[in-house]
């Protein structure tokens, strides 16, 4: 296997970035977890892979404003896959994006008009449109955007959820709700809309996000292989991941690594296994199997 691998795509959170980082950063007087923290062991392992000619890329569910600094810190070689495959960036340009249907966005618009206190955002390429409603999740977005990306194209706008939107001039890649702010009847309406629409929704403890149906980390890798990285194949690519949104790419690649503490199905599907992110699992696996 060692001599077969030419490409590495790694998830971030729970894979090479701990949910419990040692460091914090301060923005406008408030302190936030530094979810850009990658261990020295992992950074060193990636650099050693690159020195051997193996290319490194990031594949994540994060918004690019929470990835761009890390992409540059790790000096990645490959396009960066964000929003679980909905947008792919390379050298500060969008090279591919998947857009939600206008009919679906119209449906979202009609629902949020009935619940004016709900906090949500519309991800649209370099721009994110937020309600003015308080949200700890989106407060973190603003901190990462402004603290780490002062030199970028990112912009933030406010969207009024009490009026009809100009949907014809909107290209929305992802809709993201802070479900702490959404009443139960609203969640039910969103579930009903999702069920009859061409979309995929994922719900976690504090959030609900929606992207176009059929879009995943695996579909993004397949599109890159077809249109941009023709030499990248399942046989010469290894993926690292821990979550349920990593399952499809585990099935796509011939080589895959999951960590202790991962989503059970993801862990089961992975070809190889390693210690947890807090125990430098990925760095240990690379050193033992690719740098030996």
From Swiss-Prot:
Instruction: Kindly list the positions annotated as binding phosphate.
Output: 12, 60-61, 217, 245
This protein's record includes keyword Hydrolase = yes
Q: Which InterPro entries match?
A: Cof (IPR000150), HAD-like_sf (IPR036412), HAD-SF_hydro_IIB (IPR006379), HAD_sf (IPR023214)
Residues reported in the UniProt entry to bind Mg(2+):
11, 13, 242
Going by the UniProt record, its keywords in alphabetical order are: Hydrolase, Magnesium, Metal-binding
EC number(s) recorded for this UniProt protein: 3.1.3.-
Question: One GO CC annotation, please?
Answer: cytosol
| GO molecular-function terms, A-Z | magnesium ion binding; phosphatase activity
| Keyword Magnesium found | yes
A Pfam family that the UniProt record links to this protein: Hydrolase_3
**Where is the catalytic site?**
11 (nucleophile)
Cofactor(s) this protein cannot do without? Mg(2+)
Which family is it part of? Belongs to the HAD-like hydrolase superfamily. Cof family.
Task: Give the protein's recorded name.
Answer: Putative phosphatase MPN_381
Q: Which organism is it from?
A: Mycoplasma pneumoniae (strain ATCC 29342 / M129 / Subtype 1)
